[in-house]
Amino acid sequence: MKSQSKRTSRLFVFVGGVVAIIIAVLSWRYFGTGSDNNTSGAQQSARGQDTSHGGRRNTPLAPVQAATATEQEVPRYLTGLGTVIAANTVTVTSRVDGELMALHFTEGQQVKAGDLLAEIDPRPYEVQLTQAQGQLAKDQATLDNARRDLARYQKLSKTGLISQQELDTQSSLVRQSEGSVKADQGAIDSAKLQLTYSRITAPISGRVGLKQVDVGNYITSGTATPIVVITQTHPVDVVFTLPESDIPAIIQAQKNAEKTHAIVPVEAWDRTNKQMLAQGYLLSIDNQIDTTTGTIKLKARFNNEDDVLFPNQFVNARIKVDLLQNAVVVPTAAVQMGSEGNFVWTLDDANKVSKHLVTTGIQNSQQVVIDAGLNAGQRVVTDGIDRLTEGVQVEVVTPRSANTDANPASAEKAAAEAEGSTPHQGRGRPANAPARSTTAAEKS
């Protein structure tokens, strides 16, 4: 009995201890959470009081960047993909047969018209020339003798010592000898020409390519294998295509240039369309449209003194066909695309925004021409557009590149103040930091 009562008392003690621990834990959680809740409620009440006292005065305005629409002279360009071609290309071959004795050029070098390129063995043609000269000397002697005989026959015919037939025969012999002499002279000229052809010279100025035949090979005239190819790259041409719908603008640009004795400018840009390589002028237009592609070919010429254009190089050709006067221009980022069409956000004197539908014209990556819907001098929003609504007041901020980059310390201070005054923006973004604009290209 005693042992059983001891066990019972121990059990009561153990259970009592567990209950006490549970009560202590629950009490701590209850009173601790209540304190936190009270503190949080007090803070929220304080914030509510601050907001009620301050009203809208503490609500920050949406930051935007703005630009002013200006009037400018804007050139109108037409752009097409083109290929650089040599102004002239010559395939150099031999006009005579013989062994190739020497090459007098270095592959890739610039040569001038008349420079010696190669030599064919001249000895066979020297022999032919000597033979022709010898035959000429022989026939010339025969002619001289025939002429002397004719002079004697003419004297004798006057005295009647020879017949008229003998006189006529001698006259024919003289003419025959004269013909032989002329033929011999032609043979000499031909031999000299063949001898000249054994020295192959550059027919045009330009850059020689890789040699197609080595010294020591026997060359036959008229063979399909050339010795070398010369391309004229000073100047050089670019052939490019444009849609047939652009033909009227091109023709009008040509007529305007002819009236002022000017040229139609053409620019050659690299394939990424980021760097201009050369400036030239429109040389010619093809006389027919390609029915397969609906395009027309144009050829432009460039001096290419710095050799930036190379044959068969792909370029973007831009031809200037017009110059717009007093065109209203805004940054490209200001123009947005909506369900009703293109529009811009304008700013009044109170920095309140308003949506204006516009008609756009010529544009590039930097600016766009507004044909209708906007006047020069009006301010338009270029950044922070995604948070705008009709009639809302905004804060126009200076672009970061013009402000913070010049004074990093001031920028950091302003950012810290902005973060402290507007904690609800989150992610550490300053209140006056310009919002990223959504361009028409990104929306599409």
Curated annotation (Swiss-Prot):
Region (Disordered): 37-60, 398-444
One GO CC term on file: efflux pump complex
SUPFAM superfamilies for the chain: HlyD-like secretion proteins
TM spans (from-to): none
Superkingdom, taxonomy of origin: Bacteria
Biased composition (Polar residues): 37-52, 435-444
Signal peptide positions on this chain: 1-20
Gene Ontology terms for molecular function: efflux transmembrane transporter activity
Bias (Low complexity): 406-419
Cellular localisation: Cell inner membrane
Coiled-coil intervals, chain numbering: none
Keywords: Cell inner membrane, Cell membrane, Membrane, Repeat, Signal, Transport
Membrane topology value: Peripheral membrane protein
Quaternary data: Part of a tripartite efflux system composed of MdtA, MdtB and MdtC.
NCBIfam families named in the record: PRK11556.1 (NF008589), RND_mfp (TIGR01730)
Family: Belongs to the membrane fusion protein (MFP) (TC 8.A.1) family.
Protein name: Multidrug resistance protein MdtA
